[in-house]
Amino acid sequence: EASLGVTLFERSAKGMFPTPDGEVFVRYAKTVLKQVDAIENMFSGDHAAKTQFSISVPRASYIADAFAKFSKLIEKGTDAELFYKETNALRAIKNLLNDEFKLGIVRYAESFDKYYKNMMDEKGLEYELIAEFRYKLLFHKDSPLAQMDEVTYDDLRDLVMIAHADPYVPSLPFSEVKKEELPDNSDRKILVFERASQFELLAENHETFMWSSPIPRPLLERYGLAQRYCRDNKRVYKDVLIHRKDYTLSEIDNMFIEELVKAKRETFGEEM
């Protein structure tokens, strides 16, 4: 700190925390250390370059579909590691800042656009809109909702809502985030962290439903599910691709992004 002439850490009885300058310093220090490791590996006799891909994403089926198709593009004999983590928006951003993942996709309600863009600008992140959409109701084809010509919030009151348990928006109370992210019109709720479990629940318990971005048709057919808009829910959501400004997209990154755009077009169709 003395040689740099800046304060990198704030010290108190509760511990030591990085200042904004400290966060930048730590981020670049990690990058330098990784580059040193890469140079050491280059001249240690292990010359085979390993292909790596890493991304943090929301629990979205069209994104998972894109990743599955992307994985088939990795040629046999390639030394490759692919990391795919489903998590909330804040953790996706932290994974980039900590240099644990190279890419991220964050999902948030349009009303929080300013909060996220301000934070990403402050943290030195590039961002690009992938999709803009309204949530649909997702339910089994034998659900009471399937028989209705039009669905309202009141129709959901006696059903069981499945929701992801960890929405998060910086600088806002959690109660406000839940109110905006999760329309709360059901007395019974099941909170899940794993996307796979939601499909098992929807297929087995026909009184369940959840709010979801558009789902690929093959997945709907596999679990006997259907989707429909709710007349009362007009909220718009965004999926945004992010990466650090000091990171250059690799060939494998662009391969995934190409599959992501294809999956979005196939799944969203005329809703785009």
Predicted regions and their residues:
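A short LG(V/I)-centered, amphipathic sequence patch enriched
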Residues: 1-18
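Short amphipathic alpha-helical coupling segments at ligand-binding clamshell hinges
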Residues: 21, 25-28, 65-69, 248-260
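Central regulatory/effector-binding core of bacterial HTH transcription factors
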Residues: 50-116
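Secondary-structure junction motif
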Residues: 63-69, 113, 145, 149, ...
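Beta->alpha turn/N-cap motifs
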Residues: 88-89, 105-112, 140-141, 204-207, ...
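Hydrophobic hinge/microswitch elements
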Residues: 97-102, 166-226
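Flexible hinge/capping segments at coil-to-helix
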Residues: 119-135, 139-161
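A late-sequence structural motif
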Residues: 214-217, 226-272
